[in-house]
Regions:
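Iron-associated oxidoreductase/ferritin-like identity signal
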Residues: 1-172
Length: 172
């Protein structure tokens, strides 16, 4: 791979690096929150997702090799939303969420990343960038399929999952 001679590929890898880095950081952050609330199955799952993001980040670094990637400012990233596609939304998380809900959140993130990579491939005029972006999309699709298989093994959520059973802690 010659990202230093291929600015389109270097730009793609810079986006991929940021996408995976942000996803990993967010999953690790969510794992810590779930662990603090003793929601250990969900914490463990979020840590697994953080490790997968770290593996993807290593793949990006390997593809880039010794070539420095463009250093983009936050507003120079071309994301479909405010944050990178694979970054879990804070609004979608609850400290009492079930493992099923965590998998559904991760599945939506994997599908968003898959779509992003497909769109990047479709929009690129560079053959090598299209090939690598399509490969990344296929990899995300594989992760999504694995999550879908795992979801089939989990029970449906109960109706009282988000009900608070603790009294609010208010100063007297």
């Amino acid at each position: 791979m010659s990202a230093n001679k291929n600015p389109a590929l270097a730009l793609f890898l810079a986006h991929s690096s940021e996408l995976e880095s942000e996803a990993g950081d967010r999953y690790e952050e969510l794992a810590e929150v779930m662990e603090a609330h003793r929601n250990l199955p969900v914490a463990e799952f979020f840590r697994r997702m953080a490790r997968e993001a770290a593996q993807h980040l290593a793949e990006v670094a390997e593809l880039a090799g010794d070539t420095p990637l463009p250093r983009l400012t936050a507003w120079e990233f071309d994301w479909p939303e405010a944050e990178p596609p694979e970054t879990a939304s804070y609004e979608a998380v609850h400290y009492r969420m079930s493992l099923r809900q965590a998998l559904e959140l991760a599945l939506a993130n994997e599908r968003a990343a898959e779509s992003y990579y497909h769109e990047f491939a479709a929009d690129s005029s560079d053959e090598e960038t299209r090939r690598i972006a399509t490969g990344f999309a296929d990899e995300e699709s594989g992760h999504a399929a694995e999550l879908e298989r795992l979801l089939l093994t989990l029970p449906e959520n109960g109706s009282s999952l988000r009900e608070e059973d603790d009294e609010p802690h208010m100063p007297e």
